[in-house]
Amino acid sequence: MAQPLCEPRSESWILSPAGRQPPMPSDGNSVCSPAWSSDPWDGAQASSPAPPCARPARRAGTPGRRGTHGSRLGSGQRQSASEREKLRMRTLARALHELRRFLPPSVAPTGQNLTKIETLRLAIRYIGHLSAVLGLSEDNLRRQRHAVSPRGCPLCPDSDLAQSQSLGPRLSPAVCSGVSWGSPPAYPRPRVAAESWDPSFLYAETASQERQEMEPSPSSPLFSSDMLALLETWTPPQEWPPA
């Protein structure tokens, strides 16, 4: 019986996984090889690519979840900022509406619509008019401060000027009454005024005053009639022990 050219292949490699290769014949010169197989199922297995790994897909999905979370935070911050801006605008509109109530119809007519800038300008103009009517301008207030505090306030910017103005009238008579250094006085001065500045005269006057205070007069309460009677009846103590 003739021996076949190719050894019979086992069918176990057909049911093996896609990554496992069929067993190669031991004879290298054999013309039978898996590449020569005409089985279409075997060719489909060799040409089909390996299935992609699932792990990279999960990694790719992670940045998407982070991006979604960050977008939610950004939208929340934008919404809170818009809410704060709306609240600020409502507060400003309410304050300007309250200011509009204090403006008289002659300044702001009742049916006239005013913008925020126009309302502020009219209010400033009306306040300036009231200050002029009541005498509360800066010049009047400065005069009142000088009249109340002639010495000047240390916190006021014009305190030095006010102090110099207040001290000027006080010093002017003394300056006018004085004479130049080289010329003699126009009228003779009294001698008492000259003696009052003499040191010897001052010392003598002070000594006389002290002497008068040390010598009480009989009319003083220390030397009343009862005190004089006691002094007359008083006798000096005798020596002890007696001789």
Swiss-Prot record:
Record key words, sorted? Developmental protein, DNA-binding, Notch signaling pathway, Nucleus, Repeat, Transcription, Transcription regulation
Q: Name one GO biological process term.
A: negative regulation of mesodermal cell fate specification
* Predominant cellular place of this UniProt entry's protein: nucleus
Q: What happens when the gene is disrupted?
A: Mice embryos exhibit defects in single heart tube formation, due to a delay in mesodermal migration. However, the cells eventually acquired migratory activity and gave rise to an abnormal heart tube. Mice lacking Mesp1 and Mesp2 die around 9.5 dpc. The major defect is the apparent lack of any mesodermal layer between endoderm and ectoderm and a defect in the migratory activity of mesodermal cells. It seems that a compensatory mechanism exists in which Mesp1 expression is up-regulated in the absence of Mesp2. Mesp1 may be involved in the rescue of somitogenesis in the null Mesp2 embryos.
UniProt cross-references to PROSITE patterns, sorted A to Z: BHLH
Q: In which tissues is it expressed?
A: No expression was detected in adult tissues except the testis. Expression in the testis was regulated developmentally; expressed 2 weeks after birth, and increases, reaching the full expression level in mature testes.
Conditions for induction: Expression is induced by Notch signaling.
The UniProt record lists the bHLH domain at 76-130
GO terms for cellular component: nucleoplasm; nucleus
Domain of life of the organism in this record?
Eukaryota
Bias kind Polar residues: ranges? 27-36
What are the start and end residues of every segment in region (Disordered)?
Answer: 1-86, 204-228
Q: Does the keyword Transcription regulation apply?
A: yes
Q: State the span of motif (CPLCP).
A: 153-157
Q: What is the annotated localization of this protein? A: Nucleus
Q: Does the keyword Nucleus apply?
A: yes
Which SUPFAM superfamilies does this chain map to?
Answer: HLH, helix-loop-helix DNA-binding domain
State one molecular function term (GO): DNA-binding transcription factor activity
Q: What does this protein do?
A: Transcription factor. Plays a role in the epithelialization of somitic mesoderm and in the development of cardiac mesoderm. Defines the rostrocaudal patterning of the somites by participating in distinct Notch pathways.
What protein name does the entry list? Answer: Mesoderm posterior protein 1
